[in-house]
Amino acid sequence: MTHSASSTPDAARVPLVLSYGQSRPVVSETAFVAPNATLVGDVSVGAGAGIFYGAVVRGDRSPLRIGANSNLQDNVTVHSDP
């Protein structure tokens, strides 16, 4: 995940990545996740993907896969029901 605490004025500004049950988001080292984005549960973010400002990705009901080089723009919410 290309986000370095040293590159932000406030080291506490990191994406909110939350487990849900036994599932935890997995983010590629080359993906960008904005500091105020939220990832929950069974979510994977592929290489070169971007999750932009205010986006929420909820894998609490079923898996969500954000493919390589995809992007989710500002303030979008992604959620899926089984």
Task: Name what the model sees in each region.
Residues 25, 30-33, 37, 43, ...:
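A structural motif detector for beta-strand N-caps
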